[in-house]
């Protein structure tokens, strides 16, 4: 199963470990097993690291310090310990302790601005979650025993995390090679008690010495190489990269769930996700995506070819448009890229990324460039390109649902009332275009813009932290697009359910009017034929008038039915005109009654597949975001409630959804969906003819 669902397995593991970390509140840090979920939990302050007490880990730390001191005792030169830095490495000094202070001076050069909003937190500072992520990554790297950083120094950083103290770090100024020098220098300055560095706790910002004193912590003094060992690494880039990858995995899964919902809302076909198509082009991501969406459509009464045989005489589009039909081929490669990005970041989290590196087994010190964070840059650029691809697909799907010419019978702008006065989703459509334009811009690479730095010593540098920042921006934009898509999909599903119910009731009502009016004049066989033709006409004609106001739609429906009636009824024209008047009134009454009963108790979830049903119920029941009834929903000073609930702007409702995505509560719901998918076993025979998915798309799951 893992080979078929590699991305889902990775995402599920992430969600489960995050839940576990939150439950336990702590985890062990040993230099080799830091998980992306650990970084996220630390950043969000739901779990704190504790240092491993493994004697091997402790010994490794001390051994690296001993090797360094042995080199110094022999009078050997060690870069950054008794030499200058970077392009100034041709200088020498015996003042090894002072040299680490000089390193802090040359790297604590970032800009923090005075806030203009009265906040205590300086402007242009790094978000505190990102700083905490960097802190735990740096501690984990130091624990590997390659940096000549002693245990008390690592404990000092851990103590900040334990006490909820976060260094205030400038946002810009690192080229991420030689590591993230500037950001990590401010972390180091905080544990030193540098009075011009700041620490934050619960929104309160104090100079580091005072904050340490209030927490009962003492400043530390850096030994030879300990300053360099703390700042010469990729921790800021890798830490933020971990946060980005975690969110990207979740958004990838949500995008697939939303695609399943769009298939249902647009009455698309499940055939696009048939396992035969994926097997014929066996890219792992495509196979997984097709399998996932097919599972999400299980039990759907809206998607074609799920609970009914394939319609081989469709009179509308013979196949779905690309935004639905090519979803596995579009999303699949991005899942593969996200897995590689995850691997790159996971390796980086458990790597020694500074220079020089101490090998205590050979008692040697090696010069290299493990601080060159190009692996993180590579991961981040894959992530934000994937985000752009997801956004592009969601935008296309949203446009199809909102555009009356593309939606297959949904009303214009997904307005539940009269489209001449109600433009429900039009603004959302504009927002989506704005988000998509920005997301496309953000997808551009950072790596192609690097500049030579520091006496041309850093002639190539990764700009990994900047790349991660841009990827985080892309995550933010896609999160907004997903929130809009969730709102749009749920509205479209409600309207589809509402209009299907109306068509069913209107067809019955019209059949009754025909029988009452013409049964005495038309023989039974002819009458039955007329009723069947009217039924087909209502289904087809109603969907063609989505731009009209509702009463006009009812009139148009009956007007366009007149030729059918005339062909079957050879009666007085007055009878037919009278029937037309009655039929319009009957259909209008059916609409008003259907709308009223639906608004009071929507039955949409009964029609949905496994994926969209879970998402829909979460939005409607857990979040309390209702079916949007149109113009009447708009809040004004003298009209603030509807059906005993507060009215909100459309943006207000979407914001509620956005917060559930941003804070992760939506994924607590989707976790059950992921677990259901992973528990589904394949029952392939030798020729694959009995693939579970073939049964799934008929609503039969064999577990």
Swiss-Prot record:
<dbReference type="GO" id="GO:0005737">
    <property type="term" value="C:cytoplasm"/>
</dbReference>
<keyword id="KW-0843">Virulence</keyword>
<protein>
    <recommendedName>
        <fullName>Phenylalanine aminomutase (L-beta-phenylalanine forming)</fullName>
        <ecNumber>5.4.3.10</ecNumber>
    </recommendedName>
</protein>
<dbReference type="GO" id="GO:0016853">
    <property type="term" value="F:isomerase activity"/>
</dbReference>
<feature type="modified residue" description="2,3-didehydroalanine (Ser)">
    <location>
        <position position="178"/>
    </location>
</feature>
<feature type="active site" description="Proton donor/acceptor">
    <location>
        <position position="79"/>
    </location>
</feature>
<comment type="function">
    <text>Phenylalanine aminomutase; part of the gene cluster that mediates the biosynthesis of the mycotoxin cyclochlorotine, a hepatotoxic and carcinogenic cyclic chlorinated pentapeptide. Within the pathway, cctP1 provides the uncommon building block beta-Phe from Phe. The NRPS cctN initially catalyzes the condensation of L-serine (Ser), Pro, L-2-aminobutyrate (2Abu), Ser, and beta-Phe in this order to produce isocyclotine. After the dichlorination of Pro2 catalyzed by cctP2 to produce isocyclochlorotine, the cctO-mediated transacylation of isocyclochlorotine can furnish cyclochlorotine.</text>
</comment>
<dbReference type="InterPro" id="IPR023144">
    <property type="entry name" value="Phe_NH3-lyase_shielding_dom_sf"/>
</dbReference>
<dbReference type="InterPro" id="IPR008948">
    <property type="entry name" value="L-Aspartase-like"/>
</dbReference>
<dbReference type="InterPro" id="IPR005922">
    <property type="entry name" value="Phe_NH3-lyase"/>
</dbReference>
<dbReference type="InterPro" id="IPR001106">
    <property type="entry name" value="Aromatic_Lyase"/>
</dbReference>
<dbReference type="Pfam" id="PF00221">
    <property type="entry name" value="Lyase_aromatic"/>
</dbReference>
<comment type="similarity">
    <text>Belongs to the PAL/histidase family.</text>
</comment>
<dbReference type="InterPro" id="IPR024083">
    <property type="entry name" value="Fumarase/histidase_N"/>
</dbReference>
<keyword id="KW-0413">Isomerase</keyword>
<comment type="pathway">
    <text>Mycotoxin biosynthesis.</text>
</comment>
<dbReference type="InterPro" id="IPR022313">
    <property type="entry name" value="Phe/His_NH3-lyase_AS"/>
</dbReference>
<dbReference type="GO" id="GO:0006559">
    <property type="term" value="P:L-phenylalanine catabolic process"/>
</dbReference>
<feature type="cross-link" description="5-imidazolinone (Ala-Gly)">
    <location>
        <begin position="177"/>
        <end position="179"/>
    </location>
</feature>
<dbReference type="GO" id="GO:0016841">
    <property type="term" value="F:ammonia-lyase activity"/>
</dbReference>
